[in-house]
């Protein structure tokens, strides 16, 4: 489906576009009070860089740590382990540090996407319960991202949807995160088989909003 429209100025076009696609909620006030630093490689590294930035007079209101769930080193470089649980080896004491940082006015932000690392327990659980997008042979559809394969949660399956939602509530919000980056909504393969039976070529562009 292709939809076209026009407006007298950018504001009108923006109103029409967000009326169609949905309007983003207002951002929290604290976001405008300083910078969010993108940091990775563990609790001690993050803590040290927050302190160094503050000593230099930088108003830090947040840290975005995409590797909170762990990392993997590949030929592509340092990459996130897509296992949406707190990696306590890389980030020891993170739960307590998040609370401490927040008291200092620094929020902790994380990262998540629709994939799950096939090496970890979350994938084993999802696969066993039929929560993954399938290929035409009825197997979990493994998509190669940069240098490694990963499975994708099938959000058209109500149980899978609730399970993934639970991961966010328990492992991210429950940990004390002030927000996160939601990535890779564009990767649904158009030759996949979905729980709902819908055509992935049709639902592809709706995937990020599900």
Residue ranges and their predicted role:
Residues 1-210:
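Catalytic-domain carbohydrate-binding cleft regions of carbohydrate-active enzymes
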């Amino acid at each position: 489906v292709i939809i076209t429209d026009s407006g007298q100025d950018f504001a009108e076009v923006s109103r029409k576009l967000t009326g169609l696609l949905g309007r983003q909620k207002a951002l929290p006030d604290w976001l405008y009070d300083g910078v969010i630093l993108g940091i990775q490689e563990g609790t001690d590294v993050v803590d040290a860089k927050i302190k160094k930035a503050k000593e230099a007079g930088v108003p830090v209101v947040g840290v975005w740590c995409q590797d909170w769930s762990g990392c993997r080193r590949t030929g592509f470089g340092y990459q996130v382990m897509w296992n949406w649980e707190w990696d306590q080896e890389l980030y020891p004491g993170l739960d307590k540090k998040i609370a401490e940082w927040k008291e200092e006015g620094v929020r902790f932000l994380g990262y998540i996407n629709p994939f799950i690392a096939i090496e970890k327990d979350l994938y084993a659980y999802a696969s066993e319960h039929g929560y993954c997008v399938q290929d035409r042979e009825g197997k979990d559809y493994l998509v190669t991202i940069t240098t490694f394969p990963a499975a994708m949660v099938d959000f058209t399956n109500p149980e899978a949807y609730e399970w993934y939602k639970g991961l966010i509530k328990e492992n991210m919000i429950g940990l004390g995160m002030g927000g996160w980056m939601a990535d890779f909504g564009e990767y649904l393969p158009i030759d996949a088989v979905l729980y709902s039976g819908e055509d992935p070529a049709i639902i592809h562009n709706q995937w990020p909003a599900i």
